[in-house]
């Protein structure tokens, strides 16, 4: 379909473009920015006056829950929710049942994602078989089946020698490894950041060193092996400082934070609401400020939803017996726009951290508005507001922001030039 988007404020962080202009789309691609090509006649037009057109958002951490946990979410339901949040490309972590450690599981996920057609899906393969941290998964076969990177989630390698061998092997084939750096022994049994709030509530704590000790080890191993590395879900100011030091000495590492870590702190736990039970945990205001500064400076180049949908029962037990995670991909753009509203980031910088930054971190063909490139576009109204939860597409309603009025409304999400969400 030939489509013209007329009169939008077009922001493309990767090229620095920020102007009111038109976008013309044909055969899944952007064929022109500005004037239409000679002979181009649009079959469909979108009047985008007053709207911002940006690269479709790229989310590096969206649990789709299939296969194995379809009571929490399905590939169809969670990609539909992602499209509503402005997302056109997403990565799904390997913690499925069975684990994403064989090409058969990768192919199943990709087939169901294509069938749903809501967003592009890029699987992250397991670094070790069954995520047990003991035996290396078949990384090359997984890459050939469509996995774009490899990680072990929060299931850490207990044996550093085994991890080192895995990194050496990944480096040989130029594969990207995703680290969720958390020391198993220091974090074990913890439910909240080890500090005043946890003490007051009587909750077992997870010290900041659970992150920083593991992160220091992982950075040294990355330096030794030369593997391409991305650090995911950082939570502490000292953690991002370690990333900044590594980058300053020339280590090519990238990092992301969960959006909710830029908004919430451990003070949210004060009434024991399980909606704020997340792993790794919410930390202090000083940590949140450190994360915000790292996002602003570009030390952290990606913001992800870290979307973890759950069925209602998973959050109904006493705090310690509930399952951690927030369902948030559906609100990715409006929730992120609170950072602009609060003066923490300007709009082009925010969009860079939600599109070009994550795409570059994992070398994904996404995150840009370029002639000849895929027509993956989000159109949003920055002056309107979204009441979170008025419509809800994710199977997981475990979201503490439901009922809040958030800045901006996603009007259209286009994947390969096809409208996958409209509001």
Predicted features, each with a name:
Residues 37-53:
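Active-site metal-binding motif and surrounding structural segment of the metallo-beta-lactamase
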Residues 200-228, 275, 296-297, 301-303, ...:
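His/Asp/Glu-enriched, well-ordered alpha-helical/loop segment
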Residues 318, 374-423:
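C-terminal cap of metal-dependent C-N hydrolases
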């Amino acid at each position: 379909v030939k489509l013209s988007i007329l009169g939008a404020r077009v922001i493309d962080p990767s090229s620095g473009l920020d102007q009111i202009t038109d976008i013309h789309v044909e055969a899944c691609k952007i064929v022109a920015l500005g004037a239409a090509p000679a002979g181009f006649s649009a079959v469909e037009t979108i009047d985008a006056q007053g709207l911002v057109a940006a690269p479709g958002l790229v989310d590096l951490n969206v649990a789709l829950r299939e296969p194995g946990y379809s009571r929490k979410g399905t590939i169809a339901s969670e990609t539909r929710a992602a499209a509503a949040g402005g997302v056109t490309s997403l990565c799904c972590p390997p913690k499925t049942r069975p684990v994403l450690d064989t090409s058969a599981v990768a192919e199943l996920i990709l087939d169901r994602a294509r069938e749903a057609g809501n967003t592009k899906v890029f699987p992250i393969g397991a670094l070790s078989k069954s995520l047990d941290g003991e035996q290396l998964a078949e990384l090359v076969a997984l890459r050939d089946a469509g996995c774009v990177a490899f990680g072990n989630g929060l299931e850490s390698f207990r044996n550093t020698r085994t991890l080192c061998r895995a990194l050496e092997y990944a480096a040989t084939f130029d594969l990207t490894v995703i680290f969720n750096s958390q020391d198993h022994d220091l974090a074990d049994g913890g439910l909240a950041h080890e500090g005043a709030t946890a003490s007051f509530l009587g909750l077992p704590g997870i010290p900041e060193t659970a992150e920083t000790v593991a992160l220091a080890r992982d950075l040294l191993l990355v330096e030794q092996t030369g593997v391409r590395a991305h650090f995911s879900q950082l939570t502490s100011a000292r953690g991002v400082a370690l990333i900044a030091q590594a980058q300053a000495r020339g280590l090519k590492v990238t990092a992301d934070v969960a959006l909710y870590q830029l908004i919430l702190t451990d003070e949210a736990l004060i009434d024991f609401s399980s909606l704020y039970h997340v792993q790794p945990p919410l930390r202090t205001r000083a940590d949140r400020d450190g994360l915000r500064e790292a996002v602003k400076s570009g030390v952290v180049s990606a913001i992800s939803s870290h979307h973890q949908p759950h069925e209602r029962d998973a959050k109904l037990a006493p705090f310690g017996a509930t399952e951690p995670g927030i369902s948030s991909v559906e609100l990715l753009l409006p929730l992120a726009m609170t950072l602009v509203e609060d003066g923490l980031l300007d709009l082009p910088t925010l969009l860079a951290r939600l599109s070009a930054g994550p795409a570059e971190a994992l070398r994904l063909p996404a995150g840009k508005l370029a002639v000849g490139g895929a027509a993956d576009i989000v159109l949003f109204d920055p002056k309107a507001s979204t009441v979170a939860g008025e419509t809800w597409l994710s199977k997981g309603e475990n979201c503490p922001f439901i009922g809040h009025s958030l800045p901006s409304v996603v009007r259209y999400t286009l994947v390969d030039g096809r409208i996958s969400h409209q509001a």
